[in-house]
Amino acid sequence: MTTETRSLYSQLPAIDRLLRDSSFLSLRDTYGHTRVVELLRQMLDEAREVIRDSQTLPAWCENWAQEVDARLTKEAQSALRPVINLTGTVLHTNLGRALQAEAAVEAVMKAMRSPVTLEYDLDDAGRGHRDRALAQLLCRITGAEDACIVNNNAAAVLLMLAATASGKEVVVSRGELVEIGGAFRIPDVMRQAGCTLHEVGTTNRTHANDYRQAVNENTALLMKVHTSNYSIQGFTKAIDEAELVALGKELDVPVVTDLGSGSLVDLSQYGLPKEPMPQELIAAGVSLVSFSGDKLLGGPQAGIIVGKKEMIARLQSHPLKRALRADKMTLAALEATLRLYLHPEALSEKLPTLRLLTRSAEVIQIQAQRLQAPLAAHYGAEFAVQVMPCLSQIGSGSLPVDRLPSAALTFTPHDGRGSHLESLAARWRELPVPVIGRIYDGRLWLDLRCLEDEQRFLEMLLK
């Protein structure tokens, strides 16, 4: 060991001496004596390693308390941090999909703070069913006979198949064998449910006779899967649920549909592309319809199944139902969200998902122009800050080919170096409330469709 190395080691402080320093008193109060000591020991080991490898002290050795505070502050941050979503994707799967309505947030808080009548019947003091209140709401909205709630739509499809078709065949069009994010594939779900997939037709064309020829004594279901995350165009043919239900009645085989996104209102009345609705399929005679709670419906993550009472009863009594059931927070949020649909005239104001999807390009353009000046003043030395038209997308596999006209603030480096964009995006991800945009075509784009809190946005970006 050289004299210089010994000198560096000698500059490392003892933990007892550090703890006596006044700057560590508040740290010990905030994070606890044990955790502070653990971290100091870890940092001393790191410092010794740096001395050994580089013959120098880490820069933070000049202020141990500041480094401890920084590390413990970062450590204490929640894994689920609020962010400002300016990606241009409204229902961003990686950012949690639908924002919850205030009514849903309040309902969850009440359910968390107090015992609730989750499975308790106040009328006779007996045991109730956790799905009952929501089933009544869903039946009122969709016209179904009964309903069942589980923790997501993948679970809903699994339960639907396992309870009604295990050990038997399910007939599906080849063009509807979808895969969604995370490699979730309909054929794989069928295998897990104990069903045999009987695919019919071709990728682009399936006829009623294809289903008819596939039905045999082992057929349990005719199944439709809404291709919500892709579109086949051109020379195509598919039969709708009403036609398939008529065929199913003739052959005595029930029809079920995995609707995926599941909008409970006609989106075309808001100027958005129309999506098939559960109530339309129920009216057509479909026996079971499954859909998501946290996509176009705008509620919490949940899988919802509506349909005929006898079929729902089979789902409720299946062992998988208990494994897949929703908890009280999910049910509280979903009930509050569904109640908003009872007053459709106020839905676009009170339901955040619909409010964001229906923001006009003109309103967003005005917002972008309002924000451009302070951001240009702050970032103008390095970047050209401009207002640009752009196209938002709905996200989460909903309406995959449709885009919503919007406006963005774009940041273009004066020197044209892409590394500056990466650096800027990384800086914004390190903010107390990270700002998430997207890099495309030599610019960093901030699509303002989902920006409602301008003050917080400016507080972050003007730091």
UniProtKB/Swiss-Prot annotation:
Matching entries from InterPro entries are given as:
PyrdxlP-dep_Trfase, PyrdxlP-dep_Trfase_major, SelA-like, SelA_trans, SelA_trans_N_dom
The N6-(pyridoxal phosphate)lysine modification is found at: K295
Reactions performed catalytically: L-seryl-tRNA(Sec) + selenophosphate + H(+) = L-selenocysteinyl-tRNA(Sec) + phosphate
Tell me which UniProt keywords the record has, alphabetically: Cytoplasm, Protein biosynthesis, Pyridoxal phosphate, Selenium, Transferase
- What pathway annotation does it carry? Aminoacyl-tRNA biosynthesis; selenocysteinyl-tRNA(Sec) biosynthesis; selenocysteinyl-tRNA(Sec) from L-seryl-tRNA(Sec) (bacterial route): step 1/1
State a GO cellular component annotated for this protein: cytoplasm
Which terms under GO biological process does the entry name? conversion of seryl-tRNAsec to selenocys-tRNAsec; selenocysteine incorporation
> Major location, coarse class?
cytoplasm
GO MF term list: L-seryl-tRNA(Sec) selenium transferase activity
List where in the cell it is found: Cytoplasm
Could you tell me the EC number(s) of this protein? 2.9.1.1
Q: Which cofactor does it need?
A: pyridoxal 5'-phosphate
Quote any Pfam family the record assigns.
SelA
Please, which domain of life does this record's source organism belong to? Bacteria
Q: Note the subunit structure.
A: Homodecamer; pentamer of dimers. Binds only one seryl-tRNA(Sec) per dimer.
Q: Which family does it belong to?
A: Belongs to the SelA family.
What the protein does comes down to: Converts seryl-tRNA(Sec) to selenocysteinyl-tRNA(Sec) required for selenoprotein biosynthesis.
Protein known as: L-seryl-tRNA(Sec) selenium transferase
**What is this protein's gene name?**
selA
